[in-house]
């Protein structure tokens, strides 16, 4: 009892702290945490087998696996038009999956298979505490700036509202009423899936989903790198060194989830310090500068983007690349678990018949699941489909080189067949998305612009140097004395965690180099050609580097035989920890005085309406309360990243045309968009009643919203007499002149 008392007290203290900090929002917060706990525990019969070599049996990864399987199955059944997208469907699919896990657990028990981490209570407790702390921390911060307004938030929140209304997927495009969403909407889908599963309100879960992902961005790298460190250093872990795996895991988790880059160190600390020494006024620092450096400082016509998770979690967009963070981290952990399981066995003996051999190679659970995950990325974040097909292929190739004793023909044959298997499975499972998706891909272009060397060094010098140093350290140790000269012998001599770190490092470096050579063409050719390519590739490189550095620094500190590796590792660790200061800088700049709980505003993402859209808030609330389904509500269209489309974004109700640049990117038909824009103007301003009526019928408009943006855009040309003659006023603001018309049909 005495042993458990401190743990119970700590858990109770954290529960009390969460209630104090989150106030009324704590119930939804607890619901999501409890759901993740239960889903992860129920999925352990599957996860425990996949991560059998992990000390925690993949406990943290099990949460993501459960969400992935239940959410993906629900999506597949809905998009295949087998089931409607309702709360009952989400719950039903989850229950069926839970029953399946229960049956599997029963048979495992009969066969003496232990899928739970027996004897690792302290480890599981520690991981759960870390998950709860980071989930609480980010949720609390979000409550200081909860509004789904600014940057991409209208789109992200609008996607969620549209899917909450829809019983089919993809949902009707809220900014293009004649079509369905033509973008990879999977991230917002999973947020809606969890919202329906828990019976929560989307106004709260918009913010909760991003803080949920942020918590996983710490605990998954922690769990993986901790296990890698245990596997590599277990013989050296005596005395005080026993804490090394946990510390390495923490550094990896922090590197992925809250670190910045050396831009913060150079431009926020070093340069201002030098300016003060010279008696000059120190430059101020704005945290987004770390993501808009190449092309902006100095200002040249090659604007790029190089964001990273901490920036995303602070900014608050629930974009595709953000939600997919937890899924790609799960995949990386799964690949390590597979590589480890192969290396823990003896090399495959080729005596079994040809049929049995190929059956075994094609039915590897880890590869089958990896193929499904890669396919799922097509609709969660399409770029990650390409990136992690290559990462998965790299792990498969390196593993097969070792597994098949360096026999080239066998290695190439098996790797090629498994690559085809991954492509085929990923293609099949993503068919419900790809069959309804018009690709935005316009081809690959040769990069005409290149980053300045000093900029690359500031952004990527630290992780690249530490990664290359780790690779040199590992290879040098194995080549000493003339041993392991062949590629196979060298790779065979390298331990599993070292080999996996090398794969992650090579992939990360490749992702940095690619935008310097080629880019994917899109609508941003003029001055921003490399922006999207660099953004999506280097975002993943950042996470791979974070885990590689977390592992590599402590691996070299403990196990390197040359002092130079240890010295550089210490320097690297100091610089890496210095980048953690970005977290504090950005949190204060964006959220304000987070140390004052009284400033907490709550998680309601629509709370900004009362101040920013005073004239429209009552009308928007009326639509949310009274209009069911997805009828077309006409509002004035406007530019992307503006206050236009506040009605469709906050209600999920489709309008004829929304943010122009977004629809241009998604549909690439400016003539059509311009025609719709002109038609909307005609509806609001034309004096020809019959013509307006024809347009309303053509676009199947059910409601017309007349509020602040409509008066701002059309001014005195707004023909309210014609509009009112074509419908009934169903809402009239008592204070302002905003009203809603229901069109006569």
Task: Label every model-predicted segment.
Residues 584-745:
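Extracytoplasmic
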Residues 20, 144-145, 155, 262-306, ...:
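Transmembrane helical bundles and short interhelical boundary loops of multi-pass, membrane-embedded
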Residues 2, 44-62, 73-76, 103-120, ...:
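Membrane-interface junctions at the ends of membrane-embedded or membrane-associated helices
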Residues 1-122, 422, 427-478, 507-515, ...:
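Membrane-embedded, hydrophobic transmembrane alpha-helices
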Residues 26-30, 34, 119-129, 133-330, ...:
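Active-site lumenal/periplasmic loops and adjacent helix-entry segments of GT-C-fold
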């Amino acid at each position: 009892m005495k042993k458990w008392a401190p743990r119970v007290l700590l858990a109770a203290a954290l529960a009390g702290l969460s209630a104090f900090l989150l106030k009324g929002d704590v119930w939804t917060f607890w619901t999501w945490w409890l759901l993740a706990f239960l889903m992860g525990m129920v999925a352990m019969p599957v996860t425990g087998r996949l991560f059998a070599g992990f000390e925690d049996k993949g406990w943290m990864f099990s949460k993501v696996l459960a969400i992935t399987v239940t959410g993906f199955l629900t999506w597949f059944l809905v998009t295949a038009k087998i089931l409607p997208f309702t709360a009952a469907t989400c719950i039903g699919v989850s229950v069926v999956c839970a029953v399946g896990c229960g049956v599997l657990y029963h048979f495992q028990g009969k066969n003496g298979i232990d899928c739970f981490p027996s004897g690792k209570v302290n480890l599981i407790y520690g991981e759960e505490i870390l998950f709860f702390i980071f989930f609480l921390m980010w949720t609390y911060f979000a409550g200081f700036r909860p509004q789904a307004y600014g940057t991409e938030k209208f789109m992200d929140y609008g996607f969620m509202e549209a899917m909450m209304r829809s019983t089919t997927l993809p949902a009707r495009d809220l900014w293009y009423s004649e079509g369905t969403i033509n973008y990879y909407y999977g991230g917002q889908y999973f947020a809606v899936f969890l919202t329906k599963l828990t019976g929560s309100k989307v106004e709260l879960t918009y913010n909760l989903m991003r803080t949920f992902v942020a918590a996983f961005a710490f605990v998954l790298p922690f769990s993986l790198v901790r296990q890698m460190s245990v596997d590599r250093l277990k013989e050296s872990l005596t005395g005080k060194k026993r804490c090394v795996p946990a510390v390495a895991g923490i550094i990896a988790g922090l590197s992925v989830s809250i670190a910045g880059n050396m831009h913060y160190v150079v431009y926020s600390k070093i340069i201002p310090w030098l300016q003060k020494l010279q008696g000059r006024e120190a430059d101020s620092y704005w945290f987004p500068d770390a993501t808009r450096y190449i092309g902006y400082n100095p200002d040249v016509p090659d604007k790029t983007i190089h964001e990273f998770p901490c920036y995303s979690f602070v900014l608050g967009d629930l974009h595709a690349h953000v939600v997919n963070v937890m899924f790609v981290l799960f995949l990386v952990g799964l690949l390590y678990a597979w590589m480890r399981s192969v290396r823990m066995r003896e090399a495959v003996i080729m005596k079994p018949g040809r049929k049995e051999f190929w059956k075994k190679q094609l039915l590897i659970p880890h590869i089958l699941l990896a193929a499904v995950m890669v396919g799922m990325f097509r609709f969660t974040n399409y770029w990650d489909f390409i990136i992690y097909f290559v990462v998965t292929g790299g792990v498969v190739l390196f593993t097969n080189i070792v597994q098949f004793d360096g026999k080239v023909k066998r290695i190439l044959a098996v790797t090629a067949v498994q690559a085809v298997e991954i492509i085929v499975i990923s293609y099949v499972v993503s068919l419900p998305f790809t069959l309804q998706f018009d690709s935005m891909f316009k081809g690959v272009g040769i990069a005409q612009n290149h980053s300045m060397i000093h900029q690359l060094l500031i952004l990527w010098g630290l992780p690249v140097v530490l990664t290359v140093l780790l690779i040199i350290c590992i290879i040098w140790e194995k080549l000493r004395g003339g041993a392991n000269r062949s590629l196979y012998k060298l790779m065979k001599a390298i331990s599993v965690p070292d080999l996996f770190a090398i794969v992650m490092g090579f992939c990360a470096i490749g992702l940095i180099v690619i935008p310097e050579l080629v880019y994917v063409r899109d609508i941003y050719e003029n001055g921003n050609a490399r922006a999207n390519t660099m953004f999506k590739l280097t975002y993943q490189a950042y996470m791979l580097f974070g885990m590689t550095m977390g592992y590599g620094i402590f691996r070299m500190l403990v196990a390197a035989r040359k002092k130079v590796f240890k010295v550089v590792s210490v320097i690297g660790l100091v610089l890496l920890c210095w980048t953690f200061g970005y977290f504090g800088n950005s949190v204060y700049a964006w959220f304000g005085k987070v140390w004052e709980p009284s400033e907490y505003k709550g998680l309601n993402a629509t709370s900004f309406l009362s101040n920013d859209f005073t004239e429209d808030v009552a009308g928007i609330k009326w639509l949310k309360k009274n209009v069911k389904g997805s009828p077309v509500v006409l509002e004035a269209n406007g530019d992307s990243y503006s206050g236009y489309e506040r009605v469709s974004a906050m209600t999920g109700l489709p309008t004829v045309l929304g943010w122009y640049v977004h629809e241009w990117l998604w549909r690439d038909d400016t003539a059509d968009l311009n025609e719709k824009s002109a038609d909307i103007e005609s509806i609001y301003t034309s004096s020809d009643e019959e013509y307006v009526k024809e347009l309303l019928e053509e676009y199947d408009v059910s409601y017309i919203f007349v509020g602040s943006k409509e008066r701002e855009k059309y001014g005195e040309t707004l023909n309210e007499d014609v509009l009112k003659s074509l419908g009934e006023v169903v809402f009239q603001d008592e204070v302002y002149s905003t009203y809603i018309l229901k069109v006569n049909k």
